[in-house]
Swiss-Prot record:
Protein name: Putative glycosyltransferase 7
Transmembrane segments annotated in the record for this chain: 33-53
The gene coding this protein: GT7
GO-annotated cellular components: endosome; Golgi apparatus; Golgi membrane; trans-Golgi network
Family as reported in the entry's similarity comment: Belongs to the glycosyltransferase 34 family.
Subcellular location: Golgi apparatus membrane
Organism of provenance: Arabidopsis thaliana (Mouse-ear cress)
Organism taxonomic ancestry: Eukaryota, Viridiplantae, Streptophyta, Embryophyta, Tracheophyta
Length: 449
């Protein structure tokens, strides 16, 4: 991103008063003394009055219109110059049918006209998620999706991300797993201030509310997904990556990727053919239709020189992790983290939610430095993905017995919720029970229940 030119501001001051002249008489008369003392007394009264008003209670501070429209980070949300930008171009559309050209230049111009958004723009992120437009068939489906969404809202609030939730198709043909691409493109255009768009499936859950992605690692990349190069190029497996959670940079490269990616979806006249092509390469693909995940795999496999240099396949931690691998060990993870807190009083200290990242950084340095976040790690799993569970329809994979999916979801949701509600003084004492919560003792967990 090219930073705009900055101009320095100058404070100009002028004298408050000028000498009217100097006295020439060698002797000071009594009247002059009286006048001098009276003037000094009045000056003291004025100074006292000034400090009395300036030290008024902060609870009575008067807000002006300008300051009330600015957030604490200095972003001015009330300023939008009349200079023409891409929003004023009638040929630019948010839909997937028409490509967006010169997006980097368009976005740079918008930022230059809105300079208050430039500080912090390097990793500013908007999370995008969504679900179906109709009520769930599963009797508890809507409740589960609500709690999954609450989890994402909690994570975004803690880390300062914006979030956009879509529960409607933005293209009539792009449904199911393809619905994410129109939503992501629309979010890129709607949020030029954001460097990253973070797609998270409705059935994916943040189970480490402290962890943040290693942004520096992705500096030279435009797309981050959970995956493994060897499984793509050697095994040619359909499960070599998971497209249910990804970070995509808000840039022209990404716009073009979405156009190409979409070209293998239901809007393509060759949609049926693409499914056959994908299955001819990735032979463990379970169903004949072209899907977004295998389409991305196809691009990486067939056009490696074009896409692989800019796509980071994250395998060092659970960028999204298979729930059946994670949920059985959540109780052990809870105990490991409680042990850290028993060992160090800093982690037991009660604190405001707004400073949570400070305590997360302390835990990282004290206990987790150098610890990877995959299977068997001391870390909490970052994102737990309930693939195959279908919480809305209820038609989960037949390999999962009975209520395994729903019980696992409740346990993982409460595990994550404990990390949030602890800041509010309450926790789920039993991960299998959502309500009521228990108040946390003062020095918990060093002080017993």
């Amino acid at each position: 991103m090219v930073s705009p030119e900055t101009s320095s501001s100058h404070y100009q001051s002028s004298p408050m008063a000028k000498y009217a002249g100097t006295r020439t008489r060698p002797v000071v008369c009594i009247s002059d003394v009286v006048l001098f003392l009276g003037g000094a007394f009045m000056s003291l009264i004025l100074v006292w009055s000034f400090f009395s008003f300036s030290s008024i209670s902060p609870n009575l501070t008067v807000k002006n219109e300008e300051s009330s429209n600015k957030c604490s980070s200095g972003i001015d949300m009330s300023q939008d110059p009349t200079d023409p930008v891409y929003y004023d171009d009638p040929d630019l559309t948010y839909t997937i049918e028409k490509p967006v050209k010169n997006w980097d230049e368009k976005r740079r111009r918008w930022l230059n006209l809105h300079p208050s958004f430039i500080p912090g723009a390097e990793n500013r992120t908007v999370m995008v998620t969504g679900s179906q437009s109709a009520p769930c068939k599963n009797p508890i489906g809507d409740h589960l999706l609500l709690r999954f969404f609450k989890n994402k809202v909690d994570y975004c609030r803690i880390h300062g991300h914006d979030i956009f939730y879509s529960n409607a198709l933005l293209h009539p043909k792009m449904n199911s797993y393809w619905a994410k691409l129109p939503a992501v493109k629309a979010a890129m255009i709607a949020h030029p201030e954001a460097e990253w768009i973070w797609w998270v499936d409705s059935d994916a859950l943040f189970t480490d509310m402290d962890f943040t992605p290693p942004w520096r690692r992705y500096k030279e990349h435009n797309l981050v997904v959970h995956g493994w190069p060897g499984v793509i190029y050697n095994d040619r497996s359909w499960t070599a990556l998971n497209a249910g959670v990804f970070l995509i940079r808000n840039c022209q490269w990404s716009m073009e990727l979405i156009d190409t990616w979409t070209g293998m979806g239901p809007v393509s006249p060759e949609y049926a053919k693409w499914g056959q092509i994908q299955r001819s390469i990735f032979k463990d693909k379970l169903f004949p239709e072209s899907d977004d995940q295998t389409a991305l795999l196809y691009l990486l496999y067939k056009h490696r020189e074009v896409y692989y240099p800019k796509i980071y396949l994250e395998g060092d931690f659970y960028f999204e992790g298979y729930w059946l691998e994670i949920v059985p060990g959540l109780s052990n993870v809870t105990e490991r983290y409680l042990e850290m807190e028993r060992e160090d009083a800093t982690l037991r200290r009660r604190h405001a939610e707004k400073v949570s990242e400070r305590y997360a950084a302390f835990r990282e340095e004290r206990f987790l430095k150098g610890e990877r976040g995959g299977k068997g790690s001391k870390r909490r799993p970052f994102v737990t993905h309930f693939t195959g569970c279908q919480p809305c329809s209820g038609d989960h994979n037949k390999m999962y017995d009975g209520d395994t999916c729903w019980n696992g979801m409740i346990k993982a949701i409460n595990f994550a919720d404990n990390q949030v509600m602890r800041k509010y003084g309450f926790v789920h004492s039993d991960l299998g029970k959502t309500s009521p919560l228990q108040p946390v003792p003062f020095d918990y967990p060093d002080e017993p229940w």
